[in-house]
Amino acid sequence: MPRTIIEKLWDSHVVHERPGAPTLLFIDLHLVHEVTSPQAFQGLRERGLKVRRPDLTIATADHSIPTTDRSLPIVDEIAAKQLAQLETNCKDFGIRCLGVHSSQQGIVHVIGPELGLTQPGMTVVCGDSHTATHGAFGALAFGIGTSEVEQVLASQCLLQRKSKTFQVKVDGALKAGVSAKDIILALIARIGIGGGTGSVFEYTGSAIRALSVEERMTVCNMSIEGGARAGLIAPDDATFEYLAGRPHAPKGAAWDAAIPRWKQLPTDDGATYDRSVSIDADTLEPMITYGTNPGMGVSINAALPDPSQVSDPMARDSITKALAYMGLEGGKPLVGHPIDVVFIGSCTNSRISDLRTAAGLLKGRKVSPKVRVMVVPGSQEVKRQAIAEGLPEIFRAAGCDYREPGCSMCIAMNGDQLAPGEYSVSTSNRNFEGRQGKGGRTFLASPLTAAASAITGVVTDVRTLL
C-alpha cells in the first residue's frame, strides 16, 4: 500500500503499539537547552535514573544566553543560574554540552542541522515548540514538554498518538522580494493558527523544491504556528549536498549506504493524505502580521481587516482586541507605519543565508536614525562564516547592532527586548502580546522586509528598494 513520508517515518520508529493507546516511538536525536530541561534532570536524580542514550542527546545554551560580550559576567541571575545548571546537568549525566563558551554554541534548531546531527529518516525531539525546523531534512521532528523530556532522557522512547497527514502543495515561482518566510506566513494566514491541529504537514510542490535547504528550514520552523504537530519536506539531492561533510553526517561507506536508504523516504506515488491545501507561489507577495497571533497576516500592501465588516462574532472580537493592543486601525494598510526596532535573527531566520539576504539590501545604505536594528546570528558557526564574508562590517556600517549568537529578542528572556509600546519588525515566529517584551508590539516578516523597514524607519514593501 502506498505511504506518505509521514507514515514511513512513524512506522519505522514504532517500538510498541496497541489499539486505543498511545504508541511508543524510538527517538533518534534528543536536543536539550537550558530552559525546559532542569526539572527533567532533577526528576532523573530523584528516581535514581541515568540518561539511557547520552550518545543520542546533545545540549546547547540558547534561550537565556546574553547576546552581548561573552567575556563579561552574566548580569541576569536567573539566566546565569539556568546556564550554569545546564552545564552541571550535562556533566553529571554524561551529555555533550555546547555551553556559553563553546565554539559550536548556538540556537538548538540552527546547530542541529549545521553539525549534521539532523538527518533524513530520523525522529527528533526537543523541549521547544520549533523543533519542526528539522523536518526540512525529511525527519519527523516535534517539540515536547518537560515531563516528556524526562521520559526521553530515561528511555530514549516517547508515547505519542499518530497524527493525520496534511499536504501543503506550493507550486509556481516566487517573485523578487518574496521569500520562504512569506510562504509560511501566507499559509498560516489562510488556514489559521488551528488549521493543522492533529496533523503533520508535508510541504510539496515545485516552489518548495526550488528552495534552498536553509529556506526549507524557515518554512518547517513555523508549522506549529499553523497548529501542526510537525512539518517536513522529503529529502532530495539538495538535502544530501547540504549534509555532505558535516561533522556528524555519515562518512565513507556509511554515507554510501545512507543515500539509497534516504531516497526511499519520499511519499509513494498513489499515497493519499487526510487533507491537502494548495498555494500558488506566483501570486504570493511579501507578507506581514498585524495582530497578536501569527495567523493575523496580510500581504504587505493590503488593508488590515475592518472589524465592522467581519460577520463572525468571535473573529470580530479577536481582531478588535488585537488591533487595540497593536494601536492600529482596521481598513488601512501597514505600509508606512512607524517602527522602533528591527530584529533579524531567531531559529526562523538567523542562518547565514538570512544574514546574506539582509546584508545584500543594507550594503551601502544606512538604517533610519529612528530605528534600533539588532542582527543576531544563529550560531558560532554562522558568526564565523559571516565574518569570513565581511557581513558584520556591512551591518555595522549601516548602523546595525551586530551581536553574539542566541535566541535574543525572539523570546525576550535574555535582556534583548522591546520597551512598552514599541513596534518591531521581526524575523522571528511569534507575535503574542508581550512576547518580545511587556507591552511590545511585533510585526512578523521576512529578512528582506525587515531590512527594508530598517532603512526607511517604517513598514516597507522591499520591492520598492530592489
From Swiss-Prot:
Query: Which residues of this UniProt protein bind [4Fe-4S] cluster?
Result: 347, 407, 410
Q: Does the keyword Metal-binding apply?
A: yes
**Record-listed E.C. numbers:** 4.2.1.33
Pfam families registered for this protein in UniProt: Aconitase (PF00330)
Q: Which pathway?
A: Amino-acid biosynthesis; L-leucine biosynthesis; L-leucine from 3-methyl-2-oxobutanoate: step 2/4
Which leading EC class covers this enzyme?
Answer: lyase
Question: Required cofactors, per record?
Answer: [4Fe-4S] cluster
Q: A biological process (GO) annotation for this entry? A: L-leucine biosynthetic process
Which InterPro entries has this protein been placed in?
Answer: 3-IsopropMal_deHydase_lsu, Acnase/IPM_dHydase_lsu_aba_1/3, Acoase/IPM_deHydtase_lsu_aba, Aconitase_4Fe-4S_BS, Aconitase_4Fe-4S_dom, IPM_dehydratase_rel_enz, IPMI_cat
Output the SUPFAM superfamilies linked to this UniProt entry.
Aconitase iron-sulfur domain
Reactions catalysed according to its record: (2R,3S)-3-isopropylmalate = (2S)-2-isopropylmalate
| Keywords, alphabetical | 4Fe-4S, Amino-acid biosynthesis, Branched-chain amino acid biosynthesis, Iron, Iron-sulfur, Leucine biosynthesis, Lyase, Metal-binding
PANTHER family from the xrefs? 3-ISOPROPYLMALATE DEHYDRATASE, HOMOACONITASE, MITOCHONDRIAL-RELATED
* Family named by the database record: Belongs to the aconitase/IPM isomerase family. LeuC type 1 subfamily.
Q: How does it assemble?
A: Heterodimer of LeuC and LeuD.
Q: What is this protein called?
A: 3-isopropylmalate dehydratase large subunit
Query: From which organism does this entry originate?
Result: Solibacter usitatus (strain Ellin6076)
Gene from which this protein is expressed: leuC
